[in-house]
């Protein structure tokens, strides 16, 4: 199937099979389609709604072109990454969580990029902290094995995406590439907590990752619109564990945490975000600390360092109050520039 045939099919609201989608996406990722064709295809998919098989196929193709990072011990390997696009301008919660999980004994292969729709992307705030973003795959692997955290800057690992960059900028809408970003971790992490920008993606993404062989996954979207576990409202969850998917709703009060005001954790830039991250990692009582505890607790749970979400959040709070998570940030800055 070529892209013209695919467009004709999706405008009829007909899903593509995995094989059909892989053929079309391979052509896009190798520069064999025009910008007009790629644009029409992406818009058509977005209007139709991307199916589980279509998303799975795109992830497979992107992974096949990815510059991979090899991690020897994957038992507690995890990523904390979201689709972004919630438009709320909050600080980099999932980035802060990475240091808490590392302090808990996890191995965090953090996948991220500069801010596109947000005030601060994970790459922006890490650069503000002094982290070297231009590490080779070997150095990233060493950092993960030595201190429990490494950062994989998306443009370095996904060169083939370049064929879609201009089209996506011109379209200025969410496309399938926004959905698959967190699913294309270069270290092939078996465990993840993933935030998505709409509730409609929560359960489908869990099914995609089941098809792709993931081990333990939590996908979240909150009632108040976050691609994180919210400190201010209910959060919808799909959990993949032992090959089975279950859905449920959680609230901060389930974990003994008070509801917080999201206005307290909004930022204007990466420097603002870094301040909130440092305060949370120092254990300063705040909305920032509590939302980091919720999300890092989920990550601690999915990478098998806690037996339940409740235990994971409890461990995260103890780590935050001890200040050792901030030490992990300092260690990472040092190792990224010299390891």
Swiss-Prot record:
Obligatory cofactor(s): Mg(2+)
Catalytic reaction list: N-(5-phospho-beta-D-ribosyl)anthranilate + diphosphate = 5-phospho-alpha-D-ribose 1-diphosphate + anthranilate
Transmembrane segments: none
Enzyme class name: transferase
Cofactor stoichiometry and binding remark: Binds 2 magnesium ions per monomer.
InterPro entries: Anthranilate_Pribosyl_Tfrase, Glycosyl_Trfase_fam3, Glycosyl_Trfase_fam3_N_dom, Glycosyl_Trfase_fam3_N_dom_sf, Nuc_phospho_transferase
Protein name: Anthranilate phosphoribosyltransferase
The gene coding this protein: trpD
